Amino acid sequence: MVVIRLARFGRKKRPFYRIVVTDSRKRRDSGWIESIGYYNPLTDPVTVKIDEERLNYWLGVGAKMSERVKKLSGK
């Protein structure tokens, strides 16, 4: 199953996340198909950017969003 979820990047205690499309059987940070945005919780206010066109494409072909990505995207 294809899922849209967060992949952690950055360094120790300074994380930022990419919003990626990946196979659900893969590990959190490995082997994603496409990066469609990012989330930076360390900025004030929090920075979230998602390519809505690509998000809608992947949802249209059957990808499922994680709970956190649903909250961030507002869908």
Swiss-Prot record:
Entry's Gene Ontology BP terms: translation
Keywords: Ribonucleoprotein, Ribosomal protein
Source taxon at top rank: Bacteria
InterPro entries: Ribosomal_bS16, Ribosomal_bS16_CS, Ribosomal_bS16_dom_sf
Ranges annotated as spanning the membrane: none
GO molecular function: structural constituent of ribosome
Similarity comment: Belongs to the bacterial ribosomal protein bS16 family.
Protein name as catalogued: Small ribosomal subunit protein bS16
Organism: Nitratiruptor sp. (strain SB155-2)
